[in-house]
Amino acid sequence: MSAQHLHSCKFYRLPLEIIPLICRFLSVQDIQSFIRVFPSFQTILDSSNDLFWKKKNYELRIRRNRLLRGSYAAGVSSSAMNGFVNGTQISSTPAEREYYSKSDEIKNICGLPPGPMKVEQIGHAIDHLVSETHTVDHLGSSIKASFFHIDDVPLEWISSICMQVQSFFSPAAREAISSLKSRTTTSNLLLSLFVGILFEDDLWYFFNTLYMLSSTSAIEFAYFLDSIFTVVRTDYEHYRDPLSQTLITSCTRIHNIVAVIESPYDEPNTKGLTSEQKMIVECQLNPGEVLKVKAFAGTGKTKALLEFAKSRPKDKILYVAFNKAAKEDAELRFPFNVKCSTMHGLAYGAILAQADLPQAKLERQLSNSTIASLLSLQVAFPKANRKNNPGTPSASLVASHIMFTLNRFMHSTDWQLGFRHISKRSLEVTKLSKEKLLAYTKKLWSLIVNFEYTHAPLIPDAYMKLLHLYEFPNIFSKYDYILFDEAQDFTPCMVDLIYRQKHARIVIVGDAHQCIYGFRGANACAFNENLYPSTKQLCLTKSFRFGNSVAKYANFLLSLKGENVKLKGVQNDHAYWSSASNPNNVSGAFRFFPHTIIFRTNKELILQSIRLSVSLPKEIPIAILGSMRKKAFQLLRSGSELAHGQRPSHPKLKDFSSWGEFEVHVKNSAEEDAELALVYDMADELFSESFLSRLDNCEKRLMDSKDDGDNGIILATAHQSKGLEWDNVQLGNDFRPKFDSVSFSRIGSSRYLQEEINILYVALTRAKKRLILNDTITKLYALECGLVRFAGGILTEDQLQPGKVALFVDWQIDKFSFFYETPAEGYNLLVEANEKSVWDIFFGVLSGAWQNYIANTSERLKRSMLFIENQLFAVHDQ
């Protein structure tokens, strides 16, 4: 081709940025030929910033090196001379010819013809290796095909597991498995696992499913997939077919499994363990015995459990996690003799093994409108009645109380639905007799557990309760140990189910002080020795997350609940009291980046995000943790529509015709709906004309924020932050515990007060290096340390000795930290107890100079708190 023809070629008229895009889909041989014909494009490719082209180029270089390192001795085998090798090799090196020789041998054994291999052919290879008794090697000799045998497992059990695996499939995976043919039950299972690995996210679930049936076959299957995926990927690279992200990801994940198999990861490593952790690892249990571990925040319970499992390689262990994220994280950490699952996952598998349920029956949610429809509540509670009698409840409101009653049963250890599951408030709101409300609830339960009735979904708590009520084979019986992590977050139903496994050695791990899911039925009953006694008890008190500054405030909170065990920190940290803890004070509050603010409520989180989006410089990124932002902003826009008399568009609000109807529903609902509660709490803002524009500006600011990981503000609620940690944490201003002498004396018996303390404890223990308290918590700490530790009690003679009665004037703040200092003679306030509590003494009538300070009964508390603020916190601003 002449130079004139070259320059008249259409390629030269293409935009330059298109050239790297074209090369992404060419083989190396084609690219080399392309550059030889158009040498000027070499410079364009070298200077390209196209990430896909760079990735392609890098992968090809890595592949070449891998082929060279993994090649056998130089030479050409007989099978390397077939047309496939000659037609696709990118060079004539002995290493590459040998590689293609070996790949042809693999294809021959798998019953595949020589030539470029596609991903879908792996399914044929699996079925061939499982179903054929004999196959043929590359020399034509008959060899035994004894791959992937699963011995001593009934075919019925394999079929049920296969059904369970396929129930998790996405539509794409279902279509893929339907296109593959299997001749045996084992082949069908392996093909299902293969499709799951290829299409679904939960890789370790599919691998562990096979591992629990046959560890040898699972390892053999992993090696096979690693080899066959390498062949497929190489064939794709040599042809014009682009590498899909699914294929690249699958290759990497399978290779990671093999790497874990080959690594000495399962060897126990007690080096670096604390003495408390070693006691857990070395604890010996007999069948039926229970070890309880009280693990405070950040004390390394996961590492202790990991080494516990590694030190028992011959035992079958079940690790029960609270949620899917924790389960998936555990699957990456624990050895292969550990089955990781959630309680709902175990129940789900058990139910599906017994019945082939349609997808409609397996929906995860049951809305109030669906319940009302199932029970025909619209007929019993029509809208017309509410117009004539405003006190008449709506069908949706009654449905919420029926579901609340059913939830109390499903979360309990009870065997039958009864009057004990009906709350007094439900009877008051619904205006139903307890017999009628119980009848509605029983009918709903019967519809849910009727496997043939698809209109009432079998929600997760329902199949969990079924597992509790009925014995299912082979769910727990095959395990020697059960590790029950985050036990404080499980419902009594789940805890009781674990404790009934008398054949196993049970390890209960958690922190009762982090029980903050009371609205889900959790009550930390696993740590109640009266209900569930243990054989042995151990503690983890040494926190690797923070130091003694944070630990001091954590211990203060726990002491309010009567906790005697002290938490100790090992890191360097600081706790600060900010005189201007308003997050809008950029210069004062945000001295450390990245910076996380934890709030008690969603309302305060949204309000602060709106304020910060205006007050913070645009260079400082702002982010709301999780999916809260999108949901909240959509709800609030729809809530604004409702507040201004318009028909709301959001599905959760569309059934309300007016704000008044919505308000009545929220106030009288059986359980708080966090999303509806947010709209209700934001009522003042929603009625404002300017709110929507401020909300839009905030959302735009959040979307425009690009956090580089080193400089930004993260906003979260305490519930969202559980299990996470950050260097710098600030408590939001909505943490405002309001205690008096009566409420302090009731902390031990009040579930509400205990959970409020738990939420605050969770929030402040997220800090690793710096914790910034708000004003209210700081004052509460001063109040407790100076006074309230004697609230409700009588001072003993020993406690009245000088230096032992720490009242407010004995406490100062130095560098934002509290310390006790015995004041100089003449300044220590000694009072005459006269068998009264210190609280009553301080806020009661005192003698001497204090008479001028205390004016009258109604002003005592107000003036006393003002005095505390002036005396204790004034030095901060000096």
Curated annotation (Swiss-Prot):
InterPro entries referenced in this protein's UniProt entry, alphabetically: DNA_helicase_UvrD-like_C, DNA_helicase_UvrD/REP, F-box_dom, P-loop_NTPase, UvrD-like_ATP-bd
Superkingdom, taxonomy of origin: Eukaryota
Enzyme class: isomerase
UniProt cross-references to CDD domains, sorted A to Z: DEXQc_UvrD (cd17932)
Cofactor(s) recorded in Swiss-Prot or TrEMBL: Mg(2+); Mn(2+)
Compartments in which it is found: Cytoplasm; Nucleus
Family matches, as SUPFAM superfamilies: P-loop containing nucleoside triphosphate hydrolases
Gene3D superfamilies linked to this entry: P-loop containing nucleotide triphosphate hydrolases
Chemical reaction(s) catalysed: Couples ATP hydrolysis with the unwinding of duplex DNA by translocating in the 3'-5' direction; ATP + H2O = ADP + phosphate + H(+)
EC number(s) from the headed UniProt entry: 5.6.2.4
Gene Ontology BP annotations: DNA recombination; double-strand break repair via homologous recombination; mitotic recombination-dependent replication fork processing; protein ubiquitination; regulation of DNA recombination; replication fork processing; resolution of meiotic recombination intermediates; SCF-dependent proteasomal ubiquitin-dependent protein catabolic process
Pathway per the UniProt entry: Protein modification; protein ubiquitination
One GO CC annotation: nucleus
One MF annotation (Gene Ontology) recorded for this entry: ubiquitin-like ligase-substrate adaptor activity
Keyword DNA damage: yes
Pfam annotation, one family: UvrD-helicase
F-box domain boundaries: 8-56
Keywords associated with the record: ATP-binding, Cytoplasm, DNA damage, DNA repair, DNA-binding, Helicase, Hydrolase, Isomerase, Magnesium, Manganese, Nucleotide-binding, Nucleus, Ubl conjugation pathway
Function summary: Involved in ATP-dependent DNA-unwinding in a 3' to 5' direction, and ATP-ase activities stimulated by the single-stranded DNA-binding protein ssb1. Essential for viability and normal growth of stationary phase cells and in the absence of either srs2 or rqh1 DNA helicase. Involved in DNA recombination repair of strand breaks and stalled or collapsed replication forks, on the rhp51-dependent pathway: promotes rhp51 filament dissolution from stalled forks, thereby inhibiting homologous recombination and preventing excessive recombination.
Entry similarity comment: Belongs to the helicase family. UvrD subfamily.
Record note on quaternary structure: Part of the E3 ubiquitin ligase Skp1-Cullin-1-F-box (SCF) complex. Interacts with skp1 and ssb1.
Protein name: F-box DNA helicase protein 1
Species this chain originates from: Schizosaccharomyces pombe (strain 972 / ATCC 24843) (Fission yeast)
Lineage: Eukaryota, Fungi, Dikarya, Ascomycota, Taphrinomycotina
Gene designation: fbh1
